[in-house]
Design a protein with these regions (language model features):
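N-terminal signal-anchor transmembrane alpha-helix
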Residues: 2-36, 43-46
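Hydrophobic alpha-helical transmembrane segments
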Residues: 42-57, 114-118
Length: 141
C-alpha cells in the first residue's frame, strides 16, 4: 500500500474514533454518563485497533494480508460498539440483556459514533480497493 493511502486511512481512522470521546451511554444526562471510550477499552476494541494499525503500517509479502487485517480492524470497531451497546448496562444497572434497555440508555452520541464508524468502514474499502490515478493497482507495481 502506498504512503498516501496509509496516511489517509490513518487520519480517517483517528477522526472516526473522536465521537468516542463524547458521552454515549447513561441513565440520564448530567447524572450518569459514560464516554464511548468503553467501546475501545474492551478486548474487541483493543484488538480492532491493533489489527488496523498492523494491517495498514506493517509491510507483508502478500498485500492482501495487510488489507484484510485493516478491514478486520475497522469492522471490529463497529462490532465493539454494537457489543458494548448491548452489554454495558447489564452488570451495573439492569442485570439483564435487553434491547429495550440498550436503546433507552444510549445517548444520541452513540448513534453518531456508530454512523461515523460505519462511514469509516466504507471509506476504508473505497481507499484500499480503488485503483491508483495511473490505472494500476498497488499490487501490480
Amino acid at each position: 500500500m502506498i504512503m498516501k493511502k496509509k496516511t489517509i486511512l490513518s487520519v480517517a481512522f483517528v477522526v472516526s474514533l473522536l465521537p468516542m470521546l463524547m458521552n454515549q451511554y447513561g441513565g440520564k444526562k448530567g447524572v450518569q454518563e459514560i464516554t464511548g471510550l468503553v467501546n475501545l477499552l474492551n478486548p474487541i476494541g483493543i484488538i480492532a485497533v491493533a489489527l488496523f494499525v498492523i494491517g495498514v503500517w506493517v509491510p507483508f509479502k502478500k498485500e492482501i494480508i495487510g488489507k484484510t487485517l485493516g478491514a478486520l480492524g475497522v469492522i471490529g470497531i463497529v462490532a465493539s460498539e454494537v457489543y458494548k451497546f448491548f452489554t454495558w448496562h447489564v452488570l451495573t444497572i439492569t442485570g439483564e440483556l435487553s434491547f429495550q434497555h440498550s436503546i433507552r440508555l444510549a445517548f444520541p452520541e452513540f448513534y453518531i459514533g456508530l454512523v461515523v464508524s460505519l462511514a469509516m468502514v466504507i471509506t476504508y474499502f473505497i481507499v484500499v480497493w480503488k485503483r491508483n490515478d495511473e490505472g494500476i493497482a498497488d499490487s501490480d507495481k
